[in-house]
């Protein structure tokens, strides 16, 4: 005689839904340390005038900026690959893995551009690293106001200039497509 218990489900749909609501928060924190590192190293080179010294020794500007871009490109490829591998297990099993990878990769590249903007505005290492970290956190919390269906579409679109807002909207849309 079989026992009167519900059939075992390997993935609880409610747990997956709660995880996807919190997943942009985890992604934001995953990229927080590389953002801090990028901003502090860029500001350190700006403050120490090492670029001017390298220019006097014959280094071209294109080589200098290309080295920074390639270094962070490799870092973002590794991070996007790891996040894609983790998402592919249970979170987005039906989605295209390349789409998830590209989403995380472009989010990382937008953070690189964000770090360049912060470093160009603020003069010291400490102020630029602190400001980048705070703005990174604050822009994520804008999502709580924008998740309201009554918020205007134009506001959502204009605040998507911040990398965290665009990343969170992309992940929510990806989950909506995954659920349907």
Where do the protein language model's features map onto the residues?
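Short cytoplasmic-facing helical segments at TM-TM junctions of multi-pass membrane proteins
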Residues: 49-56
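Membrane-spanning alpha-helical segments of multipass transporters and channels
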Residues: 1-44, 50, 61-62, 66-180
């Amino acid at each position: 005689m079989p026992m009167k218990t519900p059939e075992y489900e390997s993935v609880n749909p409610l747990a997956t839904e709660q995880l996807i609501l919190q997943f942009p928060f985890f992604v934001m924190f995953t990229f927080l340390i590389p953002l801090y590192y990028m901003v502090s190293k860029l500001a350190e080179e700006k403050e120490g005038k090492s670029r001017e010294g390298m220019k006097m020794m014959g280094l071209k500007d294109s080589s200098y900026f290309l080295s920074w871009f390639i270094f962070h490109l490799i870092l973002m490829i590794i991070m996007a690959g790891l996040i894609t591998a983790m998402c592919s297990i249970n979170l987005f099993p039906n989605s295209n893995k390349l789409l998830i990878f590209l989403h995380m990769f472009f989010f990382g590249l937008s953070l690189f551009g964000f770090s360049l903007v912060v470093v160009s505005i603020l003069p010291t290492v400490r102020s630029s690293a602190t400001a980048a970290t705070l703005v990174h956190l604050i822009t994520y919390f804008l999502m709580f106001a924008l998740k309201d269906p009554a918020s205007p579409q134009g506001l959502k679109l204009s605040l998507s200039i911040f990398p965290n807002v665009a990343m969170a909207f992309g992940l929510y849309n990806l989950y909506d497509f995954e659920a349907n």
